[in-house]
């Protein structure tokens, strides 16, 4: 995009710095918990191991989740500083599987985007998709299941156990 806009490397870096600061400010405003997410995580915690695999920057991820209290449900977090190639490449999920010392056949991914679903599939995972407002009209033909509500993830996990 920078090349198309004719931005120099310095202009690109200044733009990125401003963008990241504005994004961090937006994240600090909170209100990002998906309805039903905490109840679902609480129900799953005693039954399965969970980790987060995200393409988010580490600093942005921390801003989001320091205020939600949801990190207590997860063993580990894989963020964009932990792998070379981002989603839709499988690298983030392969790193997650290595950390858990589990095979893809023993896990599922829960995603909200085509890029995430593609990464999970390329890593050999079954992917359950719970689209968000921005992705609800996307094509998720590679999904193991597409759900309308995050609370329905519990039923899928129950079926697979």
Language-model segment annotations:
Residues 54-56:
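Conserved phosphate-coupling serine/threonine residues in phosphotransfer and NTP-handling enzymes
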Residues 3-38:
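Metal-dependent phosphoesterase signature
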Residues 1-10, 64, 96-97:
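Helix-loop "lid/cap" segments that line or gate small-molecule binding pockets
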């Amino acid at each position: 995009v920078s090349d198309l806009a004719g931005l120099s490397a310095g202009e690109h870096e200044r733009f990125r710095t401003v963008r990241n600061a504005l994004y961090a400010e937006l994240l600090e405003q909170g209100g990002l918990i998906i309805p039903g997410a905490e109840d679902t995580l609480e129900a799953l915690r005693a039954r399965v191991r969970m980790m987060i695999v995200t393409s988010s920057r580490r600093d942005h991820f921390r801003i989001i989740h320091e205020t939600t209290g949801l990190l207590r449900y997860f063993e580990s977090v894989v963020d964009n500083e932990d792998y070379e190639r981002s989603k839709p490449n499988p690298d983030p999920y392969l790193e997650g599987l290595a950390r858990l010392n589990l095979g893809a056949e023993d896990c599922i991914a829960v995603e909200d985007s085509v890029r995430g679903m593609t990464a999970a599939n390329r890593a050999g995972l079954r992917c359950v998709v719970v689209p968000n407002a921005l992705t609800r009209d996307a094509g998720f033909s590679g999904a193991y299941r597409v759900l309308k509500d995050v609370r329905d993830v519990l039923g899928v996990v129950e079926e697979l156990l």
